[in-house]
């Protein structure tokens, strides 16, 4: 019954509530990515006060996750967060996004992020990747750690050369 809730690239283990997301970042042919690839994680926390006639307001918090050997990743899903969005970034590939809602009965998610090669990487970097990443450096509301901001700035400098 729960398998209908996810795309074919997602597998799961049962549990009380979603606590971890793990998987592998792959290129379009199924090879593992690594090196300069990384993941931006956005966790969404519900606002404490909500009036009955309002839509819920979610406060985002960002962090950066580096890949382990073989392109593997493991992301802790903060128990206070109600949703998490992962944005997979690698040079020469299009950004891949996936959003997970916390669900009762799903303990751990496994996601294979299959990246598609970008034939015009320079244009994609300038028009999509750079503005997306610069937002995390400039916007204090994301509370991205200074070391992660520095990593993003250095990464953007290397890619723009």
Task: Give a label for each model feature.
Residues 28-55:
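Short, ordered, surface-exposed loop/turn motifs in non-cytosolic proteins
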């Amino acid at each position: 019954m729960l398998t209908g809730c996810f795309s074919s690239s997602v597998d799961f283990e049962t549990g009380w509530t979603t606590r971890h997301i793990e998987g592998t970042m792959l290129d379009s042919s199924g090879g593992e990515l690594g090196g300069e690839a990384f993941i931006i994680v956005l966790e969404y926390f519900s606002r404490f006060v909500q009036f009955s006639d309002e839509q819920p307001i979610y406060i985002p918090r960002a962090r950066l996750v580096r890949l382990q050997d073989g392109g593997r990743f493991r992301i802790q899903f903060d128990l206070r967060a109600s949703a998490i969005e992962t944005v997979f970034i690698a040079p020469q590939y299009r950004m891949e996004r996936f959003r997970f809602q916390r669900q009762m009965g799903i303990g751990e998610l496994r996601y294979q992020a299959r990246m598609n090669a970008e034939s015009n990487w320079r244009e994609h970097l300038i028009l999509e990747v750079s503005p997306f990443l610069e937002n995390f450096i400039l916007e204090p509301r994301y509370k991205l750690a200074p070391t992660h901001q520095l990593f993003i700035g250095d990464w953007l400098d290397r890619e723009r050369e």
